[in-house]
Curated annotation (Swiss-Prot):
Pfam families: Ribosomal_L20. The lineage of its organism: Bacteria, Bacillati, Bacillota, Tissierellia, Tissierellales. Keywords: Ribonucleoprotein, Ribosomal protein, RNA-binding, rRNA-binding. Binds directly to 23S ribosomal RNA and is necessary for the in vitro assembly process of the 50S ribosomal subunit. It is not involved in the protein synthesizing functions of that subunit. This is Large ribosomal subunit protein bL20. Belongs to the bacterial ribosomal protein bL20 family. Transmembrane segments: none annotated. One of its GO terms (biological process) is translation. HAMAP family: Ribosomal_bL20. GO terms for cellular component: ribonucleoprotein complex; ribosome. NCBIfam families: rplT_bact (TIGR01032).
């Protein structure tokens, strides 16, 4: 059986990792070992970040809705319950956007929620 050397495979793998590490600080973008560690860590961070983004945006939307409803003397939980009883099926993303961009329509929703409590 012929001897197989890994020169081309290693070069290809190293180039792939170093390409991913482009723009990293110091030796992390030039030395393979440190670049490989940095790339692995960054991939782990990006995976976690994609999960966290969903939580963070939901928290942001709730905070915005809460702030807007409290200006109309209503808490977030009572507002959401009032909307549910009224049969309004708008998600938090849309409600937060309305609270920021369209205050008059949001005020109507708050009144609707108050009337259905």
């Amino acid at each position: 059986m012929a001897r197989i050397k890994r020169g081309t495979n290693n070069r290809k793998r190293h180039k792939k990792v170093l390409k991913q590490a482009k723009g990293y600080y110091g030796s992390k973008h030039t030395l393979f070992k440190t670049a490989n560690q940095a790339v692995m860590k960054s991939l782990a961070y990006s995976y976690v970040g994609r999960k966290r983004r969903k939580r963070d945006f939901r928290k942001l939307w709730i905070a915005r809705i809460n702030a807007a409803t409290r200006m109309h003397d209503l808490s977030y939980s009572k507002f959401m319950h009032g909307l549910k009883v009224a049969g309004v099926d708008l998600n938090r993303k849309v409600l937060a956007d309305m609270a920021v961009r369209d205050e008059k329509e949001f005020a109507k929703l708050v009144e609707l929620a108050k009337n259905n409590l």
